[in-house]
A protein has these predicted regions:
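Cys/His-rich short segments
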Residues: 161-178
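Helicase motor core with emphasis on the C-terminal RecA-like subdomain
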Residues: 1-156, 160-164
Length: 178
């Protein structure tokens, strides 16, 4: 019931407009827009609000109270769109999500599968669109480097595995056929 597609991201404004137009076209449906960084979450959230779209946002930089309120608003259909980092979604069982958009490429197929799987849980058709650009590769490499210097996951084998997962995700995005 999930339909997947990868769209090549050409540039900031063009991608923003593509996401905005998609959300407008699906204004009566619930959806999640995943972004790789808090900065992109805030930018996309403000853009949607600027165009009158009731949206929430969710990332680690928000207070616990604000995250809970936004999550509840989305879960109980007080807002239709959630813009979030991958911090959003654990424990969310909202069955009527019709689309999941990825503004940036996730770090692995496993993350992508988990996040895309939040759509269509009611068995109805849903769409998963990943907007991909070469810039996503650099963003994800920086995030992996930061992760390895800021955590116990600096083990060389863990780093190698993370980079292998990233490379598989890149292959998926760049593949021209099924």
């Amino acid at each position: 019931n999930l339909f997947f597609r990868v769209v090549t991201r050409k540039g900031g404004k063009e991608t923003d407009n593509s996401v905005l137009n998609y959300v407008k076209k699906h204004e009566d449906e619930s959806g999640i827009i995943y972004c790789a960084t808090k900065k992109n979450v805030d930018k996309m959230y403000e853009l949607l609000r600027q165009y009158g779209i009731e949206a929430g946002h969710y990332h680690a930089g928000l207070s616990l109270e604000e995250r809970k309120k936004n999550q509840d608003d989305f879960t109980y259909d007080r807002i239709r769109v959630m813009v979030a980092t991958n911090a959003f979604g654990m424990g969310i069982d909202k069955s009527n999500v019709r689309y999941v958009l990825h503004y940036n490429m996730p770090q692995s197929i496993e993350y992508y599968y988990q996040e895309a799987g939040r759509a269509g849980r009611d068995g109805e058709e849903a769409e998963c669109v990943l907007f991909f650009s070469k810039q996503d590769i650099m963003i994800n490499k920086r995030l992996l480097e930061y992760k390895s210097t800021e955590s116990i996951e600096s083990d060389p084998q863990v780093r190698r595995n993370d980079y292998q997962k990233l490379n598989r995700m890149i292959d998926y995005c760049e593949t021209q056929q099924c």
